[in-house]
């Protein structure tokens, strides 16, 4: 037996030992614990608004913290800020690169950010004295595409990239202050914890990781998916998170139990998941799929409670407002829909 084979076997044994140790701590399943709970019943949501204006596939959207404005990014090379109440466009920002994959709204509402195949995170100031929107900072440094970005505040932003790393940036200086390394595949998505002290990432190595923003260390790793993880989203409590993968499943992982609690899948669903988000209470998990639909799952019992159907192409992104009153879905059909 070659030395490499021996090392592979040792690694496999260690992996099994870790899994056994995790299982030993698992004294009950979520299905058992929630068996006495009522199911949420059928969830029926209607499209209340359709936001028309993009001329090509929409790749990303993010709600502002006022639960009214949202930003969307499209292959047409535009970043649009929408008023979801009136469907008016507040700003249409032409981008230097039309190959945009992510966008983010700052908590203050003063800035939006975007990035993609240009490997750069571009920050735009919405509140300039002149009234026009302009690039206030460009953050180059990643050696792969930018897959996701989220503001901590007006001065800091976290990015994930196809170069297998995530990074914390000081926007003022334009420098990476922390680099988060540990994934062995493209990092596709990140989600900030409610207390903004940690974040979780999902990657093409089929694993998700919990990172400490303060010291840059990976605190926990979670496996179980058998294909790329495209989306991650923290549970509102901050003690769990959901993932969506190309293996056609969503999974719920618990940080304190250090393991997977629940799998969300259906025999009829054989396509990948592009995006996931929880309702404000955490009882519902919404997931966008390649088959043009968005499924609504009972997050605690694991059953499918509804489907949001209406897009004519892949649902590429979705988000729930901070006040929990509406869901937005964005699609390759070039439209955004607001549901409740």
Swiss-Prot record:
Keywords: Acetylation, Phosphoprotein, Repeat, Transducer, WD repeat. Pfam families: WD40_Gbeta. WD repeats lie at residues 53-92, 95-134, 141-179, 182-221, 224-263, 268-307, 310-339. GO terms for cellular component: heterotrimeric G-protein complex; myelin sheath; synapse. The modification N-acetylserine is found at residue 2. SUPFAM superfamilies: WD40 repeat-like. InterPro entries: G-protein_beta_WD-40_rep, Gprotein_B, Guanine_nucleotide-bd_bsu, WD40/YVTN_repeat-like_dom_sf, WD40_repeat_CS, WD40_repeat_dom_sf, WD40_rpt. The modification Phosphoserine is found at residue 2. SMART domains: WD40. It comes from the Eukaryota. The modification Phosphohistidine is found at residue 266. GO terms for biological process: G protein-coupled receptor signaling pathway. GO terms for molecular function: GTPase activity; protein-containing complex binding. Belongs to the WD repeat G protein beta family. Guanine nucleotide-binding proteins (G proteins) are involved as a modulator or transducer in various transmembrane signaling systems. The beta and gamma chains are required for the GTPase activity, for replacement of GDP by GTP, and for G protein-effector interaction. G proteins are composed of 3 units, alpha, beta and gamma. This is Guanine nucleotide-binding protein subunit beta-4. It comes from Mus musculus. The lineage of its organism: Eukaryota, Metazoa, Chordata, Craniata, Vertebrata.
